[in-house]
Amino acid sequence: MPDSRPDTELSNPQSAKAPLDPHLKALENESIHIFREVAAEFERPVMLYSIGKDSSVLLHLARKAFYPGRVPFPLLHVNTGWKFREMIAFRDETARKYDLDLIEHINPRGAAENITPFTHGSAAFTDIMKTESLRQALDAGQFDAAFGGARRDEEASRAKERIYSFRTPDHRWDPRNQRPELWNIYNGMIRKGESVRAFPLSNWTEVDIWRYIQAEDIPLVPLYYAKKRKFVERDGMMILAEDPRLELLPGEVRQEGMIRFRTLGDFPLTGAIRSQATTLEEVIAELEIATVSERQGRAIDRDQSGSMEKKKREGYF
């Protein structure tokens, strides 16, 4: 009887165009090991899927880890309702293409109260539509482990987070109460109600991610590549101005130029950069001389002192 799964799901994710260089191969092996360890140790793992480049690499590694079987856990997308339209289209196509079990969660309280980044500010919006929403989804699914795509090179609080990041029953993170990790040995013992966030990409850098995408021919949301796009300058960021919900403030004008995004999130809170990089090779060359973190383009990382660590302590990704 013919297999009814989508044809692309049957393709072998292990067949790269050319052998990986030793550095990328070592990173890949470590990530696959982490995926398999968590899947073996925990009863109900889930993968947090935010649709960006790191999530795309994470998904590719998960497919490799369990090939020729399907990815043995669901993907969870915490949707705020303010993602770039291109991200949602890419998410839906990816789920169909690889026959994924995709869970979408939107905070019902936030939706009912019409919480937006414009009316409530980035801090309150993120707390309600991301952190609170994520806690709701994890509780509803009774998940005891959640894979995330965070990397230590992204931001200071993430630099000190373990690969197995332990969370209390209310999903809080205490950086002073984490377990040592010797070599590739991880202690996944938890009490009832506790959970773990596992980060297979912890030791990767932004350039590693892009070189791996190039080597493995991993598809991405087109927003990562430069193109003439409309934008407005607001709070020191270039905000995409192609969504009708974006209202211009006094003195603002729509501009057009070659821009791209190093990081993707909610469009009103994510700044673009001026760029001519339209190909993978050009993006990598651009990153090799970059002097600031990709997270500089996220308003939520600078809306208050110690912003990211505070959010993570409260249960953020």
From Swiss-Prot:
Pathway: Sulfur metabolism; hydrogen sulfide biosynthesis; sulfite from sulfate: step 1/3. It is an enzyme of class 2 (transferase). Keywords: ATP-binding, Nucleotide-binding, Nucleotidyltransferase, Transferase. It catalyses: sulfate + ATP + H(+) = adenosine 5'-phosphosulfate + diphosphate. GO terms for molecular function: ATP binding; sulfate adenylyltransferase (ATP) activity. Its EC number is 2.7.7.4. InterPro entries: PAPS_reduct_dom, Rossmann-like_a/b/a_fold, SO4_adenylTrfase_ssu, Sulfate_adenylyltrnsfr_sub2. The keyword ATP-binding applies. GO terms for biological process: hydrogen sulfide biosynthetic process; sulfate assimilation. Residues 1-21, 298-317 are annotated as: Disordered. It comes from the Bacteria. Belongs to the PAPS reductase family. CysD subfamily. With CysN forms the ATP sulfurylase (ATPS) that catalyzes the adenylation of sulfate producing adenosine 5'-phosphosulfate (APS) and diphosphate, the first enzymatic step in sulfur assimilation pathway. APS synthesis involves the formation of a high-energy phosphoric-sulfuric acid anhydride bond driven by GTP hydrolysis by CysN coupled to ATP hydrolysis by CysD. PANTHER family: SULFATE ADENYLYLTRANSFERASE SUBUNIT 2. Heterodimer composed of CysD, the smaller subunit, and CysN. This is Sulfate adenylyltransferase subunit 2. It comes from Rhizobium etli (strain ATCC 51251 / DSM 11541 / JCM 21823 / NBRC 15573 / CFN 42). The lineage of its organism: Bacteria, Pseudomonadati, Pseudomonadota, Alphaproteobacteria, Hyphomicrobiales.
